[in-house]
Amino acid sequence: MSRIGRLPIEIPKGVEVKVSPDNVVTVKGTKCTLEKKFPPIVNIEVKDNQVIVTRNGDDKEERAMHGTTRAIIANMVKGVTQGFEKTLEIVGIGYRAAKQGKKLVLNVGYSHPVEIEEEPGIEIVVEGNNKIIVRGADKEKVGQVAANIRRVREPDAYQGKGIRYAGEVVRLKEGKTGKK
């Protein structure tokens, strides 16, 4: 048995979990409702205020999906109650971020400002002009939006300028040594 997969998921108060016969899990909470379809090689059932994930066989794919399914459902339950957030920092002279309506506008050294649309279910907040916070209930979506923002201008290896996750350590390379 998978060490992660065999652990039951406690359902907190105010959260409702439903499993349809075709393995679609719907988690309804105080913030929103999340829905995801899982492959039929795992069995998902709700018993005694807990979600229990089991698998049919013991081949490699079923073992892998057992723990993965349990982790995704646990993240769905956490997402509808607390939510998830990723923080990004902008480092560089003249680099800044601003919010215009539902758009995030990044000035990060290009000849034009880069605009990123806010996705449904995701909230983008700009603190100051060099800190971006991405919030939402779906952990996968929050991470993907944050990665898309970071990809606009990844930290460069020589000066460290660019967009990075909060707490991310960028290893800087040493520049060329001049002629003597």
From Swiss-Prot:
<dbReference type="GO" id="GO:0019843">
    <property type="term" value="F:rRNA binding"/>
</dbReference>
<dbReference type="GO" id="GO:0002181">
    <property type="term" value="P:cytoplasmic translation"/>
</dbReference>
<comment type="subunit">
    <text>Part of the 50S ribosomal subunit.</text>
</comment>
<dbReference type="InterPro" id="IPR020040">
    <property type="entry name" value="Ribosomal_uL6_a/b-dom"/>
</dbReference>
<dbReference type="InterPro" id="IPR019906">
    <property type="entry name" value="Ribosomal_uL6_bac-type"/>
</dbReference>
<keyword id="KW-0687">Ribonucleoprotein</keyword>
<keyword id="KW-0699">rRNA-binding</keyword>
<dbReference type="GO" id="GO:0003735">
    <property type="term" value="F:structural constituent of ribosome"/>
</dbReference>
<dbReference type="GO" id="GO:0022625">
    <property type="term" value="C:cytosolic large ribosomal subunit"/>
</dbReference>
<protein>
    <recommendedName>
        <fullName>Large ribosomal subunit protein uL6</fullName>
    </recommendedName>
</protein>
<dbReference type="Pfam" id="PF00347">
    <property type="entry name" value="Ribosomal_L6"/>
</dbReference>
<keyword id="KW-0689">Ribosomal protein</keyword>
<keyword id="KW-0694">RNA-binding</keyword>
<comment type="function">
    <text>This protein binds to the 23S rRNA, and is important in its secondary structure. It is located near the subunit interface in the base of the L7/L12 stalk, and near the tRNA binding site of the peptidyltransferase center.</text>
</comment>
<dbReference type="InterPro" id="IPR000702">
    <property type="entry name" value="Ribosomal_uL6-like"/>
</dbReference>
<comment type="similarity">
    <text>Belongs to the universal ribosomal protein uL6 family.</text>
</comment>
<dbReference type="InterPro" id="IPR036789">
    <property type="entry name" value="Ribosomal_uL6-like_a/b-dom_sf"/>
</dbReference>
